[in-house]
Amino acid sequence: MAVLNQMSVLDMIKAFRRNWRAHCNSERTTLCGPDSMLLALQLSMAENNKQHHGEFTVCLSDVLLTWKYFLHEKLNLPIENMKVVDHYEDIRKTYDDFLKNSNTLDLIDVYKKCSIMTSNCEKHMISSIQLRDFLSGTECAVNDENNPHSPASPVKCSQNDKQVRLLAKKIFLSYLSLLVNSKNDLALAQILNTPDRGLGREAFTNLKHAAREKQLSMFLMATSFIRTLELGGKGYAPPPSDPLWAHVKGLSAFVNFIDKLNEILGEVPNPSLAGGRILSAIRTQLIKGHSSGEPFYKAVEEVVQDLNLRIKNIINSQEGVTVSATNISPVPPKSFAINHDTAYCGRDAVKILLVLLDEDAASAPTRNKAELLYNDQSTAPHGGASVLTLFRSPTQVKSTPVKPLRERIHTSLQAEKNKQMRQTLIRSQFACTYKDDCIMSKSKWNVNSSSKPLSALRLENDVSEGAQPSVGKARLETSSENVHVDRSKDDKGPRKSTKRKLAKSKQPGVREDIHCDQGDELYQPKNVKILKVPSDSHRKAGGKLAPGARGNRCTTKDKLIPGQTKLTRFFML
């Protein structure tokens, strides 16, 4: 019964291929078998969980429950008393978008399209219930229970060899599927790093996000990136920040190998010879680095022989149909083949590969769903990560961890200290005259400015400074004139003062009682009485000269910036 339904599914696919122009837009549209449908549904559920719960994962029980509901819902079968997971509509939409972007159709879509276009002579096509039983694997389970020849305890070694052979077959068919349909991301996920090209989960993640950003398939994104590097030149090269730069070597090897297969497909006119050369090229890549005694090497050899035989059988069967139907042209005219997805000489080989892939899509589903969906490196080192693990790879967010409070306070204090040190170091050559402790606060001016005139305010300030000179003022005069406390250097004061008096006597326009710049300070009236300063204020702070001991030069000086008058007098000499 299972074999009968499998043949019915294959007949349905053949009817679809005969009228492909009415069903799809491209001749190279590939079909998803039961296993590929289940994998696509799993990825859709994981994507939905990531959007709603933030984690790209899904448990096996939810996948099987949704798979059962999905088959009944899409085949328009009764779904009473059937459980369904949350957000099923979003899952279904994600599933349909994934197949559409991959240029693929599942068997249920093929069944619906063929049901609309089926003629009266083809009413013997498979029913919806039979297709449901075939996709769910119910018939296979019943057939195994009724088969008395199945061993009760299979040998472990033979089971491992069988798994390796199935893996090798999957790799070959994935290469052929990507060769026919370059948009098939599911096939690319299974062969991107087979054999090892250094394209692990990180490379797959970067390629996936780059493809989504530019709305391309993953293989077309990789091809575009490599072609830009090879043919675009420096002006068209991707930016250095592109994450694909780290995987240039592996992506270049993968794209060049697919180009080599496409060259064989387009240059060899004989479909049988072209198929054999393509399989031989894939075989050479897979067995590189393996000895002839390894199970994987033997499995690859067996798969190559089996696929070569199947290709020859397909060609022979098509030739027999062509001879029997003499009124149908075996090959469309050359003008029709132009601009139909491939060159004319390679179109026959593409048709043969499509038939080979359709036969695989009509094969029975895998009984062990857990091994199909969640098997990571079961046949290491050839199996690699599962499809869910590859698509789960998230974008790594570079976030700095939060530092402890003690460390943050220490960092801020250290930064403030360094800032103050930089401010004190960057000074001019006259920085000795700019002292923070000598600058008068603004509050002192604001309190008395409203009640007293400016001239009286200046006189009071001069008298107060002359009567009670501060230590800061003495320190200012000492630092500005480079005079130290020791008495040996204190004797040089009169010499400097006499030189300044001689210099002032040569300038008739400058008065002794007013030493200021007329552009910066107000003119002082002549009738202002200058208050005398006590003589005991001339010696303060260890014998230093007080400001009032300099011949009353600073008594009428306008208080601007300390040292400005001295600098002005220096440049007037």
From Swiss-Prot:
One of its GO terms (cellular component) is cytoplasm. Residues 463-511 are annotated as: Disordered. Residues 495-504 have a biased composition (Basic residues). Coiled coil: none annotated. This is PCNA-interacting partner. Interacts with RAD51 and PCNA. Interacts with PARP1. Interacts with TASOR. It comes from Rattus norvegicus (Rat). The gene encoding Arom is located in the opposite strand of the gene encoding MCH. Its main location: cytoplasm. GO terms for biological process: DNA repair; negative regulation of double-strand break repair via homologous recombination. Required to suppress inappropriate homologous recombination, thereby playing a central role DNA repair and in the maintenance of genomic stability. Antagonizes homologous recombination by interfering with the formation of the RAD51-DNA homologous recombination structure. Positively regulate the poly(ADP-ribosyl)ation activity of PARP1; however such function may be indirect. Binds single-strand DNA and poly(A) homopolymers.
